[in-house]
């Protein structure tokens, strides 16, 4: 399973970098044609922030894949947590792909030369569901702050209200709902572990994930 997760992430990386190279070449070839028709105009600061956000979405997906693989191990066997984190990983990957599609729709390369996936986050050899959910909540808060940063960069730099509105409507609402859901899960799990220290996590995995 770990191999399939790894190769899946590698495939995403290769595909994204390939898109970047092809789009960059196409932009170089058509630069003369776009000098007089700025349909693809996006402020540099705004575009750089969008590139960073795309990177963050895929980074979050990798972290959630690692936790999903951890809980899927036969010696851990918490299928509720496994399903939750695989679903979360898929959502973050979808977010990244949607931003790639948006950048392409605006006539821009979806990633720049600084694009690099972060594999450094290590899941401890022994971890708990509570710890994993708290890590996920921290990551979602980080992603939300980053989205707000993109919105600010695009509004302040060139009044790019289309991108700002897209991020506000498509992303921020889902981010805030996701953070609330994670906070509720953490609170419920803590209560169950307090009332049943040995069975709390098992019952939570079965009934609340």
Swiss-Prot record:
Catalysed reaction, written as an equation: 4 Fe(2+) + O2 + 4 H(+) = 4 Fe(3+) + 2 H2O
UniProt cross-references to InterPro entries, sorted A to Z: Ferritin, Ferritin-like, Ferritin-like_diiron, Ferritin-like_SF, Ferritin_DPS_dom
MF-aspect GO terms: ferric iron binding; ferrous iron binding; ferroxidase activity
Listed Pfam families: Ferritin
Gene Ontology cellular-component terms listed: cytoplasm; extracellular space
Enzyme class, broadest EC rank: oxidoreductase
Subcellular location: Secreted; Cytoplasm
Signal peptide residues on this chain, from the entry's feature table: 1-27
Record: residues binding Fe cation 1: 57, 92, 95
GO biological process: intracellular iron ion homeostasis; iron ion transport
Residue ranges constituting the Ferritin-like diiron domain according to the UniProt record: 40-193
E.C. numbers: 1.16.3.1
Induction notes from the record: By blood meal, iron and hydrogen peroxide (at protein level).
Entry binding sites for Fe cation 2: 92, 140, 175
Keywords attached to this entry: Cytoplasm, Iron, Iron storage, Metal-binding, Oxidoreductase, Secreted, Signal
UniProt cross-references to PANTHER family, sorted A to Z: FERRITIN
Complex formation: Oligomer of 24 subunits. There are two types of subunits: L (light) chain and H (heavy) chain. The functional molecule forms a roughly spherical shell with a diameter of 12 nm and contains a central cavity into which the insoluble mineral iron core is deposited.
Membership in a protein family: Belongs to the ferritin family.
Protein's job: Stores iron in a soluble, non-toxic, readily available form. Important for iron homeostasis. Has ferroxidase activity. Iron is taken up in the ferrous form and deposited as ferric hydroxides after oxidation.
Protein name: Ferritin heavy chain
Organism encoding this protein: Aedes aegypti (Yellowfever mosquito)
């Amino acid at each position: 399973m770990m191999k399939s997760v790894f190769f899946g992430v590698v495939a995403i990386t290769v595909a994204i970098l390939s898109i970047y190279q092809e789009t960059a070449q196409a932009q170089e070839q058509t630069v003369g044609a776009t000098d007089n028709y700025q349909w693809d105009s996006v402020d540099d600061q705004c575009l750089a922030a969008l590139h960073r956000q795309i990177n963050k979405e895929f980074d979050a997906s990798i972290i959630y894949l690692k936790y999903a693989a951890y809980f899927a191990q036969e010696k851990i066997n918490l299928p509720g947590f496994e399903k939750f984190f695989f679903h979360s990983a898929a959502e973050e990957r979808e977010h990244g792909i949607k931003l790639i599609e948006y950048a392409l729709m605006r006539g821009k390369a979806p990633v720049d030369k600084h694009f690099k996936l972060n594999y450094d986050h290590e899941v401890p050899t022994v971890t708990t569901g509570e710890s994993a959910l708290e890590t996920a909540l921290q990551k979602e808060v980080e992603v939300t702050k980053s989205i707000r940063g993109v919105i600010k960069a695009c509004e302040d730099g060139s009044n790019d209200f289309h991108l700002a509105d897209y991020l506000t409507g498509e992303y921020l609402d889902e981010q805030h709902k996701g953070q609330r859901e994670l906070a509720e899960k953490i609170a419920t799990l803590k209560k169950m572990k307090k009332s049943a220290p040995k069975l709390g996590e098992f019952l939570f995995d079965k009934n609340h994930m």
